Regions:
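Enzyme catalytic cores with a strong preference for nitrogen-chemistry domains
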Residues: 1-330, 341-368, 408, 413
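ATP/NTP-dependent adenylation/nucleotidyl-transfer catalytic domains that generate, transfer
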Residues: 2-5, 153-155, 213-214, 225-226, ...
């Protein structure tokens, strides 16, 4: 048997950021060599970046990826075997490929057989799936090399591949690799984060290692690679159905290695591409791995922990990769803007804990013109500007909540009275119409002008700071258009537009009382959590609340999941709701349930144009409403009139 040290890398890559991507790859190779790794698996498409989208159609992107592999990366692979991910064009078709390099020599390429085409994935738009059991030859750097469904013998060890989605299909390549007596399977992945997905990947890794009765190496991206998708850096190594090594998730490092030493048999194969790599002999089936899973991974509130860490890391990468000098936030004193504010604070906390204040300051050096803040709280004040914009309909409750949250986390706090701006607009329009605007006649317009009147000042602050303006809409509001376009939707990124309001309220209560593992709760959130969500756009005496305008958020979110995620028609939604325990808890009769269903479908259909214009949002689950990458719906439609009439 041969003793082999395996490594899976998590890399924080960026599409078409050639220099940085290569720097990360070379760092991973250097770290692997320093740890005496024999075989290193890098993530899927790591040279070009996974999220290049239609840039994959550019011949220049394909040519540059191959050029960098041959000229800049391969020369650093002496005494180690490395799998690199890159796009390859063969006979007029583009493939998602992995290059196998052993001891400075390019040995061949494996092409992905199953393309991801669901959810936010559009791989079939750019790539062609490679047929199983087929190979061809490709000319690279003067050599004819095998390309396709290829396996390799590295120092006598038989190595094969599953590339990300390959492991998720029912007839996965691992079964065929087992029949070829493969000892090690490498899985270079770009598997985006979603709640609970870590356990699914773990099961796939365990099953893969059982199928081949050998070792399985799973590499992945980490961070916010291209803007919307978040990668958790989930890296694992399994042997014979047991996870022997697992890396940390949501790291603020650009490169993280997970390693394990395994004993693998020497097998003969007439079809595998041979290569020489010196491996030591061992008589024992030894397996030595290192698991760096943190305590929060076993938390009873894992979803809350994952949300805190995923969105914080996504904000960090979005800020630094866009070269923004921090954030600006219209802090209303409500749940949504409070969530966004504390996520920035958690971003600083998590980063400082992992890479230290000096390390964080170095990563964000473009943000500071003078001296670097000396404490994490002062760093929050440098990076986050919050502004409370009051009108005559604002309350002291929300103002106090906004100021308390800002001071608790260390953010800079400003207050602006925009009532004069709103009144000036009302006066101008009244003059044009030659009548007074009234709440009875002009309710919606009078609400919206307040939200829109806040936009210019907060945009101006963002321009002055050269910071990123954060929008605060959530998924529940996006579903029914309960938001003012060019008002509270203003921003360069909408961090929480992919999560429902009910969960956000639960998360804020958790953060008030408990907080993340290793961190502290933020008790000042009680001033937010004690409130009923309200837009504060109507006169105070009307006691406006979101749920009185719409329906209970729990009901709204349930209908949304059934109608949009599960693609149910109104009659199907009604059948489910009539038997649902949540409806029973509200003691709602059939008439009320029908009214809720009608309101949802009507508002959903009417407001697709708003969802088309939302700032980009982060993906955290399988219920996103982003029309560009997840849920497409016509801007103009019949609005389910026939189906809704049939409910009566």
């Amino acid at each position: 048997m041969k003793r082999m040290k395996l490594a899976a890398a998590a890399l924080n890559q960026t599409p078409i950021a050639w220099e940085q991507n290569c720097q990360n790859i070379l760092s991973a190779i250097a770290q692997a060599k320093a740890q005496q790794v024999d075989l290193l698996c890098l993530p899927e498409l790591c040279i070009s970046g996974y999220g290049c989208e239609d840039a994959f159609m550019s011949q220049g992107v394909l040519a540059t990826s191959l050029e960098l592999l041959v000229e800049d990366l391969i020369p650093h692979t002496q005494c180690i075997a490395v799998a690199f991910g890159l796009p390859m064009r063969i006979a007029g078709r583009t493939y998602n490929a992995a290059a196998m390099v052993v001891d400075g020599q390019l040995k061949g390429f494996v092409a992905k057989q199953n393309l991801a085409g669901d959810g936010l994935h559009y791989e079939p738009r750019w790539f062609t799936a490679w047929p199983a059991n087929e190979q061809t030859l490709v000319q690279v750097a003067g050599n004819k090399l095998p390309f396709g469904d290829v396996t390799f013998r590295i120092g006598g060890v038989h190595v094969g591949f599953e590339i990300c989605e390959d492991a998720w299909v029912e007839e996965r390549p691992a079964t065929r690799l087992a029949s070829r007596k493969v000892d090690v399977v490498l899985n270079p992945s770009a598997s985006h984060f979603a709640f609970g997905k870590h356990q699914v990947r773990r099961q796939l890794l365990v099953a893969g290692s059982q199928i081949i009765q050998g070792a399985y190496v799973y590499a992945n991206l980490v961070g916010n690679e291209a803007g919307r998708a978040i990668y958790d850096g989930d890296t694992m190594i399994g042997v014979d159905g047991v996870v022997v090594a697992s890396g940390p998730r949501f790291s603020y490092l650009d490169v993280v290695l997970t390693t394990a030493v395994v004993a693998v048999p020497v097998t003969e194969s007439l079809t595998a591409v041979p290569s020489e790599l010196e491996l030591s002999e061992t008589a024992e089936p030894v397996t030595v791995g290192a698991t760096e899973e943190c305590a929060w991974e076993t938390s009873t509130v894992l979803k809350e922990e994952e949300f805190a860490r995923a969105l914080s890391l996504a904000l960090f990468d979005y800020m630094r990769k866009s070269y923004s000098r921090g954030f600006v936030l219209s802090l209303s004193g409500g749940a949504d803007s409070a969530t966004v504010a504390v996520l920035v604070k958690l971003m600083i906390d998590f980063a400082v804990k992992e890479i230290g204040l000096s390390g964080l300051a170095h990563r964000l050096r473009h943000c500071f013109e003078g001296s670097v803040p000396e404490t994490p709280k002062k760093l929050v004040g440098e990076l986050l500007w919050c502004v409370y914009q009051t009108t005559r309909n604002s309350s002291e409750i929300t103002r106090d909540a906004a100021e308390s949250i800002a001071h608790a986390i260390g953010a800079r706090f400003y207050e602006l009275n925009v009532d004069g701006v709103v009144e000036e607009y009302k006066s101008l329009v009244s003059g044009v119409l030659q009548r007074k605007l009234t709440w009875d006649r002009d309710d919606l317009a009078l609400q919206n002008i307040q939200a829109r009147g806040r936009a210019p000042s907060v945009w101006m602050l963002a321009n002055i700071k050269r910071g990123l303006l954060l929008a605060t809409s959530n998924r529940s509001e996006a579903a029914v258009g309960y938001t003012t376009m060019d008002g509270d939707t203003c921003g360069g990124i909408s961090p929480i537009a992919g999560i429902d309001k009910a969960f956000l309220r639960e998360w804020l209560h958790w953060l008030e009382i408990t907080g993340p593992e290793g961190g502290e709760p933020i008790s000042e959130l009680r001033k937010v959590n004690a409130q009923q969500p309200t837009a504060e756009l109507r006169p105070p005496e009307e006691n406006q609340t979101d749920e009185s305008d719409l329906m209970p958020y729990e009901i709204l979110d349930l209908i949304e999941r059934l109608a949009i995620r599960d693609k149910m028609m109104p009659s199907e939604v009604l059948r489910v709701l009539q038997q649902h325990e949540l409806i029973a808890s509200y003691k709602a009769d059939r008439r009320q349930v029908i009214d809720w269903i009608k309101r949802f479908f009507q508002l959903w259909s009417r407001n697709q144009w708003k969802r088309e214009r939302f700032a980009p949002s982060f993906h955290v689950d399988d219920e996103n409403l982003d029309p560009k990458t997840w849920c497409r719906f016509p801007i103009l439609s019949g609005g389910f009139r026939r189906e809704l009439d049939a409910l009566e």
